[in-house]
Amino acid sequence: MKIQSLTKKCMAALVMALAVSSCSEPIADLREVDTFAQAKPVWAEGRETEKNLTLHFREQFNSYFASTAYVKLTASCDYRLKVNGEFVAHGPSVAAHDFYRIDCYDIKPYLKFGTNIVALEVAGYNDDNYYLLNQPSFLQAEVEVNGKVVAATGKDFTAYDLKQRRQDVREFSFQRPYIEHYVLDPAYEEWAVKKDWAEAEPVKLSEQEAKQLLSRHVPYPDYTVHQAEQIADNLYSFKCNSSGFLGVQLQVAEPTSLRLGFDEILSGERVNPGRMGCYAYVTYELQPGTYTLESFEPYTMKFMEVYVDKGSCQVERVYMRDYCGSDVKRATFQCDNEEANELFEAARETHRQNAVDIFMDCPSRERAGWLCDSYFSSRVAFDFSGHTRIEKNFLENFLLPKAFKHIDKGMLPMCYPSDHPNQNHIPNWAMWFVLELEEYLHRSGDRELVDRAKTRVYELVDYFKPFLNEDGLLEKLSRWVFVDWSAANSLVQDVNYPSNMLYA
């Protein structure tokens, strides 16, 4: 008995000693990490410009007494991070051409005693669009436990081309890259959860050119999971329009092909996935078995319909994992008019879905950061959050590039970060950038960013000078002169009075 008691005391002392020795200081602000200790940008050798290629990266490590544990990463185009099979995050936060923002996640809550697996799906689209820039693909990531890097791209992490996602597919819309079409069997997630998994041949990775790195700066998203209700055969409804990752639980009895179609409204009594000029489907080809499937990209919907094109399956659950702004609770409103109360909450819900890392005009068809829209969104953001972090990122993205590809010298893109190979722009949208800068200074006191914008604003003024007529009015502006779908666009030609009022 005395020996057993002594052994227990020794073990307890050893555990305490190990715990104390492994302590490290936590990172003060996960939003402001802007460097890697060891990680290098990597991708499959010679395939960094290949269209619509998804690679699966994994690394396993041992952890027994973790006081701190983080994953730091960035990528082009985007990633999904899981630890021991559990969803952690989607990212990164968008940035200007040739700049990349680092995300940093506390993964301590996901760790187990012993072997742990960090798994990353990374999609490289290399496609011109308004959401995810057409830039060479890469992943740069490292795992830090107790202040020490235990895995880093460039020397650790193994990558696989599992071909679970088809490459030869159409775009979701003109403004967004490729649709999701998967070919899976029930073992499709073993690569992310199985210790010492080696069921596929790894791809050869090569180091890519060094990247210009920035901090994320903005709050991390809200990933709340909520359920849909079945309202008819194969038809499901969420409580309200929702933006995030569409999930389904399925039992598949035989080889089955199915599509999950979605929209924000019903057309008649069913979903019309093409209504908004999108191909609003996620497609799966499945072998018999049990599945919990979740889209890689975020979408917007209230209604979802299941189309079984071949075979049969039983849908057991439909859910949404939100991908929305998390810091929107500062403002409150309550009165004796319930319709007014509902209107306020609808405004909050609309804002949170359109303010993840920049201000977007819509979270569905485009996910684009449009000027003009941002002028009004930024006012609401300050009311709902009490800070200007998202607005700073939005404006800074317009300041970071030395020049904009395919845009006339001095002009600003109508939306950004985005690709504009058709050379289109909205001249009067650039004026809203200047107006927003003034309000941003009043809201934030951030003189440093406004001063950085001086050259860009002066170049914009110089751009407009050749269009001034003898009356000092702008005449025959080039490209798309746009007053947000107003009939004023067509009433008067050459001298557009709404544009001149904005210019004045």
Can you annotate each of these PLM segments?
Residues 255-264, 374-400, 453-465:
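Carboxylate/His-rich catalytic cores and anion/metal-binding grooves
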Residues 2-11:
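Bacterial N-terminal signal peptides that target proteins for export
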Residues 27-364, 373, 387-394, 405-409, ...:
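Extracellular/oxidizing-compartment recognition motifs
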Residues 237-238, 293-295, 358-371, 418-430, ...:
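Solvent-exposed loop and edge beta-strand segments that line ligand/cofactor-binding
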Residues 309, 376-387, 432-449, 501-504:
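Well-ordered alpha-helical scaffold segments within catalytic/enzyme domains
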Residues 455-458, 462-474, 488-492, 496, ...:
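Large, well-folded core regions of big proteins
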Residues 20-22:
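C-terminal motif of bacterial Sec signal peptides marking the signal peptidase cleavage site
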Residues 350-353, 397, 401, 443, ...:
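Structured segments of extracytoplasmic/periplasmic soluble domains
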